[in-house]
Amino acid sequence: MIKNGTCPYWERDDLSECARREYIEFKFPLFILLTGMIYAFCKVFRAFYLRGKNHTNEAPEFEEQGNGNHEYARFSVLRLKSAWESRSFCNVNNRSTFDKFKKFIEGAFIVLQLTIHLYILSSMPMDNKKFFHQGFLVQMFLWILLLVVITLRLISASQSFRWVLACKRDLWAVSFYSYASLFTLSILPLRSVFIGKIKDKIMVKYIISETFIDLALLLLLSTSSIEGTRYSFLVENENKKLPPAPTVFGLLTFSRIDRLIWKAYKHCLGNADIWDLDINNKSIAILANFEMSSKKGRLLPNIICYFKAVFISQLFLAFVSSFLNFVPSLLMPRILSYVNDPKSKSWNLVSLYVSSMLVSKIIATTCRGQGLFLGEKGTMQLRTVLISNIYSKTLRRTILKDSTTSLQKNASTSFEENPDSSEAEPRKKSSRKDNSVNNVMSIDAFKVSEAMNTFYLACEAVFMTVTALMILYSLLGWSAFAGTFALLAMIPLNFWCATFYGNYQADQLILTDKRTSGISEALNSIRVIKLLAWENLFYQKIINVRDGEIRLLKKKATIFFLNHLIWFFGPTLVSAITFSVFIKFQNQTLTPTIAFTALSLFAILRTPMDQIASTVSLLIQSFISLERIQDYLNESETRKYEILEQSNTKFGFEDASMEWEAAETSFKLKNISIDFKLNSLNAIIGPTGSGKSSLLLGLLGELNLLSGKIYVPTVESRDDLEIGKDGMTNSMAYCSQTPWLISGTIKDNVVFGEIFNKQKFDDVMKSCCLDKDIKAMTAGIRTDVGDGGFSLSGGQQQRIALARAIYSSSRYLILDDCLSAVDPETALYIYEECLCGPMMKGRTCIITSHNISLVTKRADWLVILDRGEVKSQGKPSDLIKSNEFLRESINNDSKNTTHNQIDLKRSTTSKKTKNGDPEGGNSQDEVCAEVENFEETKMEGSVKFSAYKWLADYFGGLGVVFVFTSSSILIHGITLSQGFWLRYWLDTGSSGSKSTWLYRIVEGHSNIYFLLTYIIIGLVSSFLTSGKVWIAIISGTNVTKKIFAKLLSSILYAKLRFHNVTPTGRIMNRFSKDMDIIDQQLIPNFEGLSYSVVVCLWIILLIGYVTPQFLLFAIPLCALYYTVCTLYLRASRELKRIDNINISPIHQLFAEAIKGVTTIRALADERRFITQSLVAIDRSNAPFFYLNMATEWITYRVDIIGTLVLFSSSVMIIMKASYLDAGLAGILLSNAFSFTETAQWIIKVFSSVELLMSSVERIKEYTDIPSESNGYISPPANWPQTGDVELKNLSLRYSPHSSKALDNVSFKVKAGTKVGIVGRTGAGKSSIIAAIYRLSDWENGTITIDNKDIKHIPLERLRNSISCIPQDPTLFDGTVRSNLDPFDRYSDVQIYGVLSKVGLIEECDELCLIFEQEQPNFSSHKLRNRFIDLNTVVKSGGSNLSQGQRQLLCLARSMLGARNIMLIDEATASIDYISDAKIQKTIRETMKNTTILTIAHRLRSVIDYDKILVMEMGRVKEYDHPYTLISDRNTIFYRLCRQSGEFENLFELAKVSFDNKR
């Protein structure tokens, strides 16, 4: 009996009558009345005072404030609000009519309750009712308060009482709080009624009616949508689905997602089926709130500050859940005591214990679910914050090398930034590459965000550990501290393991960066790699890095094994030490009740110990990743917004000196003073490497400004500029030398966020000579350009990039050599119709070019650059007198001006003939321009068995899997035997004197024998369990090594068309996220699944063996378990696949931003790109959010099912108490306790395996892609010996549905003949090279080289036998030597020889090198040529070289090593004419006996060749000597020469060549 003064709380097995009257009926209701009344009064008074001014149905407004977290306003999320709202609208999820009707029912129940109170109060006798009257009066006042509250909630819909809306949610909260509290208070009196303790009929009726009404009211509110909560949604279109309005029941049990789960069960889900996110979970809201709460400084404190409310809530929920989880353990000794002696306690009391176990577990489950879901929601929000900040940083990051490190470098560092790079590569302090930057977003951001899930688990682990130790102390006394000290002794070992694990993780991330950088570089240059037959070279380089990763993964597995062994053996060691001390030193008897209660606590303790181990490991990984993100966010940012000065009258430089980086060898622009002529065409010319592109980048503010000033029209964001009457804004548009396109349609790339105007669009297409190409494409302007424009020819890419600049509303255009990639006819047309046509009215245009005769013809201002200095500038007519080369070019052009204008008009007219078909024919030059808009496919249904079998085959087949599962059964059998051994030991008796306990003989054995056996069983079990995990991970690592090699080989050797239609970001997703999942998550989850299934089966068999009646409960419970699992698995599978697909666009946007950051900043379009990233993040977050909700949905239900198993087991035990011994009951209950966790773990792990297997499916899909067809006949070693090439009736198309790129092409090239291939852009010129290299399979026809059909020759041999200089000069990360000779086949002399031939080094360079070697103190930084040192660094893509230097280096690479056939695809387009002439001379002199096929837009480059092949519409139109063709006015070649602007020179050169060969 528990007493409180004169009033006992508890009498034997029930609440006392005085306690019920004092507390249940008076004090507790009074507390509810006072708190509810005060809270409601405060909220109503405030709402009345404010008159509802703050209530709105719209989305919450974000005030335009901030703390300067971002340096520039254009990157502020708060400033994005207006842009976001302009493309979205608010939708409000209002309450249903049925929900509104429920309020009237609610009011009726309250009136009924008041009526019952009045009736009972008037009918009860007046004697001995001191507390009774007070209690009834308090409860009456409480119900009157609730009647007032429901009245206010009902009248809120009236216009006269709209102010109530402001406090409607608070009034609803008062009602729910009161109903829930009253129902909870009514439970114990109701129990008293059921067990017969209350016998007064009126009181019985009152208690039953009160409980029923309280329950009814609680259910009404729990199942109705929460009042006062307007869930507003910013959605992109009206078809976006909204989730159901939230209810208390739905939020607590996650039933809100029932509809989506049921829909997924009936059919496969798509993006359209996924509900939208509410405004609080939209990225714009998350980032705005984060920005307002953040301060300048490190990321970690800002994250903690922003999520502090989440952390506090999780802390509270973890405390409640942890405490309630131990209630069953606290009640277990009482139940076992009853089993041991059924007469010691009443059955009513024991049933209360069992019921309390059920209720406590349900509440603990609810709290745990809410805590975990808060963490998962925080994971999504943190991921949003990190990805958005990384993306925003990418748009702010400088394209220059970090000055903080460059200053520390030795001045003799190899070469630095290029003078003419248009899209330079961003860099990090530690030489971070763009490709590794992608890992910061795709891997590190995800790892850090996952740490949000660990906070709740960490708190729960700490609370559970402390609570368990406290209970153990109360159970075992001070001997529990012995176990505690043993537990503490393991912590340093754990941290030692964690330290090693963290170090290995950091090293692995470095190698992962290196691997993904290599893969990204290979994917971006795959065409060139195939042309050079370097697939195996890149394969080996990447595999070597991968091998280092594998070694680190195995080291991590070993550390994980040790860590697992420590914590798995911990409970056994702790229990053994505790029991020994309890018996020996405390001289106590270890009874089954105490032993198995302690074991149940130790079993529960194992969970937090495991959580601590895994949490520490994950937190270490997260902190490493967070540091990498912080390093990235700390990198230098562009200073363009500081150094650029706004001017309405001046556009140019004033005595400006600029550099790429602070190094003596860095290229510099010195003392630049240029005042570009407004509303005019300004041209910049100069030799290769003179600094033309650097000058334009300097004008955009991308270079370091050392001195002087730079004047631009504006530095404002594009969205903030006013549109003039002419539709223009004072902004700049930039077209880089290397065209940058986004993944999307042609229309998307041209319109580029501007308002679409069809007439303007058509005019731009026509002026950029794209209208005919568009007509030839099946999808027209909706044709997908592919990843970075991969599905277009180089000329088409350049013209689309130009069209983007022309279509923009910018009044100032900056064009970097945008005419070099197109043929002369097209270049002339674009120049006349676009750059000098009506589209340029009122615009200022600055253009750089090597085509001097063309661009200076109608330029108003001319700037001549050389070696970073302005040599001269002025009107072209004034510069003729002082510049002989310029004068000769312009004079030559003037002779042909009349002819050119006439021919231009004639060609423009002729292009409109032939039923509208473009004269150039097919617009697929290199690859199919009609490529479909390929969306990433989503697997449907469950993961196919073939995927599991495919993975199992790498392990050695299904037999190995069977052996592995069987070992799990055996190992857990050993684990269970430990409990039976303890029961056997206790049954034999373990008490004795303190001095003789260890040596007392029991049945022929001492107690030390039993203790050591107990420890050995635990040690063997732990070692086998941990060893099985280690073997699984090591085996999995070997498997992932094979899978990666297969995937890499499949991608590298895939047909080029696969790369044309598949975005690089999508492929990289396989190599980064999917591969990381297989590396580190899949195999441990498989192992955990097999272990959990075995444990559950053992538990069910054990309980069924002890209490066969349990099977009656087990069958429906298993059916329920199967049902919810099936529902969940289908939904989670679909949601995960959609999540996987929706992640790829984020990768794609990030990759595009890295490549095009200069263009984006030039257009001042950062805000739009940030908005696009937020939209992509929201699309990715939606399935991720509902996937997490579905995960908690199944977790909650599995926990409830597990609780029912525990409840039914306990019921069976107390029902069979007279037939069971306490030891067996203890074993059964101990295992029943762990069933909930194990069953939950099964579904979690199985669903994780299913979700993770989607990554296996995705990788398997890419390992099954068709590879290039290889030949089988190896030619002789000296093949090709002569170099004869013949094409017969060759037809080629790039996709089954596209038109032919080559149509019945036939021509023959004799050995040593030099053939120039000409024709307008898209005529099929590059397709000839593609056919010869077998980059695409042709439909029919043959190609023979030295009379051997190349279709039967192995690809590597074929491609190694031909030299090629591709259209896009592609270089790789490494050195000059590694780019020229990666296999180390040639000497330095040979390499210097080819560098000299292409003009990259001269004799004076060699003298400088000798002089430096002889006189170390001599400094020749200003004179020394960077290519002298063959170990000079070349950045990925050659980003630290000018376009011309890249082309020359590629030319040198092809000339290194004599081959009898060379194919040149527009290799000199980006170098000046003088250098071009020298190179052509070199080719003629050094390759006299080499068969050369050259694609050229510069006709001068091929005018002295042996033959000219004219292509049109994929057909051979003309094939003869240049002089023969140019002499015939009816030939296409004649027209091309006329339109080139240098007809007279071409004619003379052709005639001289013809005469010399006659």
UniProtKB/Swiss-Prot annotation:
CDD domains with a match to the protein in the record: ABC_6TM_VMR1_D1_like, ABC_6TM_VMR1_D2_like, ABCC_NFT1
Localisation: Membrane
Membrane topology recorded in Swiss-Prot or TrEMBL: Multi-pass membrane protein
Main location group: membrane
ABC transporter domain: residues covered: 651-892, 1285-1538
InterPro entries in the cross-refs: AAA+_ATPase (IPR003593), ABC1_TM_dom (IPR011527), ABC1_TM_sf (IPR036640), ABC_transporter-like_ATP-bd (IPR003439), ABC_transporter-like_CS (IPR017871), ABC_transporter_C-like (IPR050173), P-loop_NTPase (IPR027417)
Positions glycosylated per UniProt: 4
Gene3D superfamilies recorded: ABC transporter type 1, transmembrane domain, P-loop containing nucleotide triphosphate hydrolases
UniProt keyword annotations, A-Z: ATP-binding, Glycoprotein, Membrane, Nucleotide-binding, Repeat, Transmembrane, Transmembrane helix, Transport
Residue numbers on the Cytoplasmic membrane side: 51-103, 152-169, 223-302, 375-449, 505-558, 606-953, 1035-1082, 1133-1199, 1244-1558
Binding site residues for ATP: 686-693, 1319-1326
Biased composition (Basic and acidic residues): 424-434
Pfam families on file: ABC_membrane, ABC_tran
Protein name in the entry: ABC transporter NFT1
Organism expressing this protein natively: Saccharomyces cerevisiae
Gene name as annotated: NFT1
